[in-house]
């Protein structure tokens, strides 16, 4: 039987504080998984990591570790891994088809500096990432949660901002991209708070050299401008 992502209940994901409150930053999608995607998930060849309530023992220092949150079909993750073969990338997403796509491409291209997790990234940050251990975090095109009553679900908010800062090395970065102007405005306002300007520097920047994701292609086709942010942890 072909499984859809909606067959997963919220109880299958780690119960972080935010989830116990019934608030999550991701949205289950009604999407089908192909046979090739399912095969990649079922045969991960040690590239797929299970969630655990202990710190991740990968990679071995001094290899820099980067976290890619919500990688979609994995195009950006693959490009980063190819560009920086001496770095390590932990890619986290909750959607099985995308996980299958990324695992399949990693196997086909024989890329070994990426590990993949199908779970809630906030739970991973809270429980598996050592404080001060990340060289950078990528969050490209997170769900904008456009309705005002859903803004509390956005991944770029104060509580999560503090969590991200605690896991980054001094000088580590958080790269965020969005195609929704109201979300971009709220990100600018959040990082401009006095308490945050003491901890973070930089902000909006010209689009860096990075892979164009499938979602970004659609946004551009529909006429939405993309805003990139690059914040450095002090």
Describe the residue ranges of each PLM region.
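Class I SAM-dependent methyltransferase "Motif I" SAM/SAH-binding loop
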Residues: 70-74
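A short glycine-rich, Lys/Arg-flanked "PGG" loop and its adjoining helix->strand segment in the class I
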Residues: 156-170
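Conserved beta-strand/loop positions that form the S-adenosyl-L-methionine
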Residues: 69, 92
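Conserved beta-strand signature within the Rossmann-like core of class I S-adenosyl-L-methionine
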Residues: 170-178
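S-adenosyl-L-methionine
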Residues: 2-65, 75-82, 103-131
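Conserved SAM/SAH-binding beta-strand->alpha-helix loop
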Residues: 95
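Class I S-adenosyl-L-methionine
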Residues: 186-189, 193-234
């Amino acid at each position: 039987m072909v499984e859809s992502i909606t067959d997963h209940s919220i109880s299958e994901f780690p119960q972080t504080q935010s989830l116990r409150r019934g608030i999550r930053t991701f949205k289950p999608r009604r999407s089908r998984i192909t046979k090739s995607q399912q095969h990649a998930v079922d045969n991960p060849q040690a590239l797929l990591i299970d969630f655990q309530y202990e710190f991740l023992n990968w990679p071995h220092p001094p290899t820099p570790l980067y976290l890619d949150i919500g990688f979609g079909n994995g195009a950006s993750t693959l490009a980063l891994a190819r560009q920086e073969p001496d770095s390590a990338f932990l890619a986290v997403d909750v959607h099985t088809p995308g996980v299958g796509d990324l695992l399949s491409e990693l196997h086909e291209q024989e890329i070994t500096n990426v590990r993949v997790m199908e779970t809630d990234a906030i739970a991973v940050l809270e429980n598996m990432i050592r404080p001060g251990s990340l060289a950078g975090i990528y969050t490209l095109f997170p769900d904008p949660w456009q309705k005002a009553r859903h803004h509390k679900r956005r991944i770029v908010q104060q509580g999560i901002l503090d969590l991200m800062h605690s896991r980054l090395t001094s000088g580590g970065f958080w790269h965020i991209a969005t195609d929704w102007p109201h979300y971009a405005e709220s990100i600018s306002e959040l990082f401009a708070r006095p308490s945050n300007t003491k901890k973070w520097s930089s902000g909006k920047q010209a689009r860096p050299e990075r892979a164009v994701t499938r979602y970004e292609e659609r946004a551009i086709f529909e006429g939405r401008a993309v805003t990139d942010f690059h914040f450095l942890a002090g």
